[in-house]
A protein has these predicted regions:
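Histidine-centered active-site loop/cap adjacent to the catalytic His
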Residues: 1-3, 182-197
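Short hydrophobic segments within beta-strands
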Residues: 3-4, 36, 127
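Conserved SGNH/GDSL esterase-like catalytic core that processes O-acyl groups on lipids
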Residues: 7-106
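Extracytoplasmic/secreted cell-surface and envelope-processing proteins
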Residues: 10-12, 93-102, 132-142, 176-181
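Stable alpha-helical elements in mature extracytoplasmic
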Residues: 14, 18, 68, 72, ...
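Loop/turn elements at helix/coil->beta-strand transitions in domains of secreted/extracellular proteins
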Residues: 29-34, 80-86, 118-125, 161-167
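Active-site segments of SGNH/GDSL-like serine hydrolases
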Residues: 88-93, 112-146, 170-172
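Substrate-gating cap/lid alpha-helix
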Residues: 129-170, 188-192
Length: 197
């Protein structure tokens, strides 16, 4: 289950999601898999190796951690129990003028709890998110961004169990402005970069 906001949903042709590039990599690998989620975008994706792109996902543009926390139980029940959840840009759309940073971390932990409650053997991969365009990186932004990059590692370590592996993946190192279609969303190069991580 690809879970998150607009970087998961994509909005072709304006900007890309990593899902199509990841899907092609998985098809090439020969791994049997099925993307899950209650969302399904209508963008045009070319067939690959004679197969049609699996469009299912759980990405919603603009959604914040409180909204994901509120919706996750219903989405999991509707879409089916995932074996693997790819949790993109946790906290990325949270406005810290209306929610505390500690509440964002509580939401991320609660989202992981909800996934583990429905599948105690789930593998949960939490992004250390790729940064936005350099000109968007104010000192205030960087203070929060750098902190959450570290805090999701702590969350993953604490939330891992003997049956449910929670891990992080570094999407930030090596990511450049040339991989963005606008201030925050991926272009094709950015989508490929994220998919290969």
């Amino acid at each position: 289950m690809p879970l998150g906001a607009s970087r998961v949903a994509g909005a072709r042709p304006e900007y890309e999601s990593y899902r199509y590039e990841l899907w092609k990599l998985l098809v090439n690998s020969g791994i049997e898999f099925d993307f899950t989620g209650t969302e399904n975008d209508g963008a045009n994706y070319p067939n690959f190796n004679g197969l049609s792109f699996d469009r299912d996902h759980e990405g919603r543009g603009g959604i914040n951690s409180s909204e994901i926390r509120s919706g996750i139980d219903a989405w999991l029940r509707e879409s089916g129990v995932p074996d693997i959840v790819l949790f993109s840009s946790p906290g990325g759309n949270d406005d810290l003028t209306s929610i505390t940073y500690e509440s964002v971390l509580d939401n991320i932990n609660a989202i992981v709890d909800a996934i583990q409650a429905i599948n105690p053997e789930a593998t949960i991969i939490i992004e250390q998110a790729a940064p936005p365009m350099t000109n968007e990186q104010t000192s205030e932004f960087l203070a929060v961004y750098n902190q959450i990059i570290q805090d999701v590692v702590t969350i993953a370590e604490r939330q891992s169990t003997t049956t449910s592996k929670v891990m992080t993946v570094d999407m930030a190192t090596g990511f450049t402005d040339a991989m963005l279609a606008d201030d925050v969303h991926y272009n094709e190069a950015g989508a490929r970069f994220i998919a290969t991580r």
